[in-house]
């Protein structure tokens, strides 16, 4: 019986899709703007259509899922229309990149119920919300306001006034390193794109941008440019036809990348993680502001190895079977990093240089030992000691840090707490600083 019902529902959905393509959704006939609560009746569902992005067949599957739940609750099947065939209307449930401004929200605005559930990740979350919290009765009233947000996508933070650049470090978690609690990169890419739109870092050092991230990241960067006018370009995404896990993103609508390069310290293979090659390296680039070419600076990005315990109890470099003492590991990583940073300082006298990275080393290592890369300062400690504006002060357990050398002023320092909404994307907290120089 259940199978028969599902077949029936699929047929109805397909028929509605076929009938709805190219048709206009019903408009608000009165044109009046209501100032009171939104009064919803189940028969009003007949006005709505589900508009899905035709870039990806997954969105039609999500439209079917939502239609199934609405039919089960109300006995109504909505028209399903491809975004390329849909005329904008107040009565839409939007799935994916439909050509409208991405909002990732369910709101009541101007007396109308507006639903836009964004990409595939937020679509799943919002569909659950709609069916459990909104479409839960034959009638209900909603006051004006916001009822659903993918909060990580909308927690906008403007850059501090008088800052030259916002520099961020972000480990976005390679699929191979993610446990079962995380979605695959093609889902999480939506959250990462939302973070870029909300926080708009100027230069971003990313770690663990693996092969799966490479498959989807450029597509989302293109969507950001189309929908928000923010242009991000990638630097050093690969090296010798191998993926560079520690690459750079930068806003090419604000800055020019004058030069870029990377230095590889070693390669390793690990079949267990399906990595044929993984490079340990420092990537860097020199930038200048488009509106002030004299403002030049460098950003370097790295990812330090972390130790693993093998069955015999020996500590090894990640991906290696060669035993190594913990202090030897730290010394090796810092010496490798110092070697390239010292060269960059010599070749760029007087130019501020900033280092982003996942150091797999908690804050006390730097604060207790007093070690920083050659002539560099730990920006979080510098911000604390100078009374700079700080939000979400980091715990001592995080591994992601920013360093700087040269003449600069910290306008703001922020740390994303990975115990809340941020954990949907990665197991690492992001960190950024607004800097003037």
What are the functions of these language-model segments?
Residues 16-20:
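C-terminal motif of bacterial Sec signal peptides marking the signal peptidase cleavage site
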Residues 22-110, 114, 118-129, 133-157:
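Acidic, contiguous N-terminal accessory segments
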Residues 156-222, 297:
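N-terminal, active-site-proximal structural segment of metallo-dependent hydrolase catalytic domains
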Residues 175-177, 211-215, 243, 307-310, ...:
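Active-site environment of divalent metal-dependent phosphoester hydrolases
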Residues 281-302, 313-361, 365:
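His/acidic metal-ligating clusters that form di-metal
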Residues 341-354, 359-437:
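Metal-dependent phosphoester-hydrolase catalytic domains
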């Amino acid at each position: 019986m259940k199978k028969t019902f599902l077949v029936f529902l699929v047929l109805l959905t397909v028929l509605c899709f076929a009938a709805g393509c190219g048709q206009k959704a019903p408009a608000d006939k009165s044109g009046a703007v209501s100032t009171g609560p939104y009064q919803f009746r189940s028969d009003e569902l007949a006005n709505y259509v589900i508009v899905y992005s035709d870039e990806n067949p997954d969105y039609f599957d999500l439209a079917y899922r939502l239609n199934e739940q609405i039919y089960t609750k109300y006995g109504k099947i909505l028209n399903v229309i491809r975004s390329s065939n849909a005329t904008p209307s107040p009565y839409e449930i939007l799935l994916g990149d439909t050509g409208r401004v991405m909002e990732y929200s369910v709101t009541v605005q101007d007396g109308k119920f507006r639903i836009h559930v964004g990409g595939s990740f937020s679509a799943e979350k919002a569909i659950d919300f709609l069916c459990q919290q909104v479409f839960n009765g034959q009638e209900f009233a909603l006051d004006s306001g916001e009822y659903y947000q993918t909060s990580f996508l909308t927690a906008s933070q403007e850059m501090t006034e008088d800052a030259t650049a916002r520099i961020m470090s972000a480990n976005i978690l390679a699929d191979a390193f993610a446990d079962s609690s995380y979605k695959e990169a093609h889902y999480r890419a939506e959250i990462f794109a939302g973070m870029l739109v909300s926080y708009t870092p100027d230069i971003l050092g990313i770690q663990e941008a693996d092969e799966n991230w490479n498959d989807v990241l450029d597509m989302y960067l293109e969507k950001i440019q189309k929908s928000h006018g923010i242009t991000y370009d990638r630097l050093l995404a690969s090296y010798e036809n191998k993926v560079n896990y520690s690459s750079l993103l930068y806003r090419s609508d604000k800055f020019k990348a004058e030069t870029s390069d990377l230095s590889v310290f070693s390669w390793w293979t690990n079949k267990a993680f399906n990595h044929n090659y993984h490079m340990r390296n420092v990537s860097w680039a020199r930038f200048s502001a488009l509106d002030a070419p004299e403002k030049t600076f460098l950003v370097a990005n790295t990812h330090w190895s972390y130790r693993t315990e093998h069955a015999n109890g020996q500590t090894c470099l990640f991906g290696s079977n060669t035993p190594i003492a913990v202090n030897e590991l730290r010394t090796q990583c810092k010496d490798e990093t110092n070697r390239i940073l010292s060269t960059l300082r010599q070749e760029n006298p007087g130019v501020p240089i900033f280092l982003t990275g996942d150091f797999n080393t908690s804050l006390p290592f730097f604060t207790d030992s007093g070690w920083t890369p050659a002539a560099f300062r730990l920006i979080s400690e510098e911000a604390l000691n100078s009374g700079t504006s700080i939000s979400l002060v980091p715990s001592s357990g995080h591994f992601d840090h920013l360093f700087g050398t040269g003449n600069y002023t910290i306008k703001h320092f922020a740390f994303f707490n990975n115990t809340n909404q941020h954990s949907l994307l990665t197991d690492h907290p992001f960190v950024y600083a607004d800097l003037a120089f």
